[in-house]
Amino acid sequence: MTKIKICGITRLSDALESCRAGADALGFNFSSLSPRAITPERAKEIIEKLPPFVASTGIFVDQSPEEINAICRFCKLQIAQLHSEQYSPEDARAITEAKVIKVFRPEENFAVEEVFAFAEKSGINAFLFDAYRPDMAGGTGETIRASLATRIFNALGDSCYPILAGGLNESNIGEAIRSLQPYGVDTASGVECEPGIKDPVKIKAFIQAVRKTVF
């Protein structure tokens, strides 16, 4: 069954609505440049009220491994998502307070060998692929070109746990899952009425669309 992460959570009501609808994980963005930015203090308040079996994920863009470990420990995050090209395999190995997901934002000439090399050097086995945009790390509402995504996911096969992100919504998620068969999918803008404010109807529709898709 395809795993689902609802990202860019800023309000408790949105977090609980996502959980009730069947989300497997929630994402909290700690980048001050994001329109969905949240403080560790506020994230901790929300995470403490989550039901069991929902993984809390921190999105990090410019923090050091030491800062990431401290935030993960403080908030009791289960996953640290490294959403920047600046993070090296050594950085990933230095994060010990949570499981790590490394993000790639591939352009057309992306070499899949980069993923294999990062996995070998870091020891991590989960990678998220998001649409590339130079001025924004995630939550752009833009999708990865279908041919590029297909090339990447086909090459990866069962070597890791690939997660698809980038402009996913109720309308396009079914075809994306059937085509790529990702381990998980991640959406932020696809279930919002404005950045950081989720729409309960869109959340339910997105999760239902994922659950009814088989491959």
Swiss-Prot record:
Xref: InterPro entries: Aldolase_TIM, PRAI_dom, RibuloseP-bd_barrel, TrpF_fam
Domain of life: Bacteria
Residue ranges of the TM segments: none
GO biological process, one term: L-tryptophan biosynthetic process
Family statement drawn from the similarity comment of this UniProt entry: Belongs to the TrpF family.
Protein name, as recorded: N-(5'-phosphoribosyl)anthranilate isomerase
Species of the source: Pelodictyon phaeoclathratiforme (strain DSM 5477 / BU-1)
Lineage: Bacteria, Pseudomonadati, Chlorobiota, Chlorobiia, Chlorobiales
Catalytic activity field: N-(5-phospho-beta-D-ribosyl)anthranilate = 1-(2-carboxyphenylamino)-1-deoxy-D-ribulose 5-phosphate
